[in-house]
UniProtKB/Swiss-Prot annotation:
Family: Belongs to the class-II pyridoxal-phosphate-dependent aminotransferase family. Histidinol-phosphate aminotransferase subfamily.
Signal peptide: none
Modified residue annotations for N6-(pyridoxal phosphate)lysine: 217
Any matching Pfam family: Aminotran_1_2
Name this protein carries in UniProt: Histidinol-phosphate aminotransferase
Biological source species: Salmonella paratyphi A (strain AKU_12601)
GO MF, any single term: pyridoxal phosphate binding
EC number(s) from the headed UniProt entry: 2.6.1.9
Domain of life: Bacteria
Coiled coil ranges: none
Enzyme category, top tier: transferase
Any Gene Ontology biological process: L-histidine biosynthetic process
Length: 359
């Protein structure tokens, strides 16, 4: 029998895909809980009514109402907005549009969001890491030393999973370092919790700046899978060349347009205020809990904390149906768990469970 006839289907796959470790999303990790505080979702659902019923027709590639509503909300021109299946698709589009596999590299600064790495590896693009400094700010010298051959640099601000904003002066320095050399992608998935820190006002000054946004967090629409890329028109036109013909279904576009109406944006801001209030309650309670070593500052809808025995705490709460996010495998996050801010009842269950832990 010839070798060709004995190859498995897996052997036919690209080598980098066979070796790929997929992103471990909260849903993929599973669990049988009733308090889900591991995916940075809003804890309660928002109701919408569909107004578009023409499901026999293909949708617009870039639904006009969604684009115009988001442009108005973000303070940019409609030509500077692209809508996609979550911000994750935006990550992939930028890499596909700007990076030559086997030639170019992306750069990111762990501990940070895992999809930058996974998307690049899937496409066959080199990944370079410049670990963040001890305070989780950018190592600008390390980044500068790694820019040769780097085509895209990803920065998450506020950073997931650490929760802090990146120093704006460091971001400006990074944009100057990369001018004419690389695209800088600022991931602003959590910017609604600290809107004063957005970089949208910098888009005119830095044509190589790309900003990622989402409806999954403050807009409470993680199940919708709707994200946005903000950039200058030239970048958007390049991304439109590689995006799928119909990225948003008609129901998704319908709900997204409603969420981005003046009424929808006001409701989002009310949710943010509620989340910030609950975050402070949770921080105060964690700081008075014996098994908690340190609670890190957060500008988001989640809190990172270091525990005296994080593995046993994580498992104990898991067994009680309280699902948190273990960060022990992330660089510099040994002993850390990430806790999404939930409802008052959910937050109290977390605190009660933690205070029952042996010290």
């Amino acid at each position: 029998m010839s070798t060709e006839n004995t190859l498995s289907v897996a052997d036919l796959a690209r080598e980098n895909i066979r070796n790929l470790v997929p992103y471990q999303s909260a849903r993929r990790l599973g669990g049988n809980g009733d308090v889900w505080l591991n995916a940075n979702e809003f804890p309660t659902a928002v109701e919408f009514q569909l107004t578009q019923q023409t499901l026999n027709r293909y949708p617009e590639c870039q639904p006009k109402a969604v684009i115009e509503n988001y442009a108005q909300y973000a303070g940019v021109k409609p030509e500077q907005v692209l809508v996609s299946r979550g911000a994750d698709e935006g990550i992939e589009l930028v890499i596909r549009a700007f990076c030559e596999p086997g030639k170019d590299a992306i750069l990111y600064c762990p501990p940070t969001y895992g999809m930058y790495s996974v998307s690049a590896e899937t496409i066959g693009v080199e990944r370079r890491t410049v670990p963040a400094l001890e305070n989780w700010q950018l190592d600008l010298q390390g980044i500068s030393d790694n820019l040769d051959g780097t085509k895209v640099a990803f920065v998450c601000s506020p950073n997931n999973p650490t929760g802090q904003l990146i120093n704006p002066q460091d971001l400006r320095t990074l944009l100057e370092l990369t001018r004419g050399k690389a695209i800088v992608v600022a991931d602003e998935a959590y910017i609604e919790f600290c809107p004063q820190a957005t970089l949208t006002g910098w888009l005119v000054e830095y044509p190589h700046l790309v900003i990622l946004r989402t409806l999954s967090k403050a807009f409470a629409l993680a199940g919708l899978r709707c994200g946005f890329t903000l950039a200058n028109e030239e970048v958007i036109n390049l991304l439109l060349k590689v995006i799928a013909p119909y990225p948003l279904s008609t129901p998704v576009a319908d709900i997204a347009a409603q969420a981005l109406s003046p009424q929808g944006i006001n409701a989002m801001r009310d949710r943010v205020a509620q989340t910030v209030q609950e975050r402070q309650y949770l921080v105060n309670a964690l700081q008075q809990t014996a098994c908690v070593e340190h609670v890190f500052d957060s500008e988001t809808n989640y809190i990172l904390a270091r525990f005296t025995a994080s593995s046993s705490v994580f498992k104990s709460l898991w067994d009680q149906g309280i699902i948190l996010r273990d960060q022990n495998k992330q660089p510099s996050l040994s002993g850390c768990l990430r806790i999404t801010v939930g409802t008052r009842q959910e937050n109290q269950r977390v605190i009660d469970a933690l205070r029952a832990e042996p010290v």
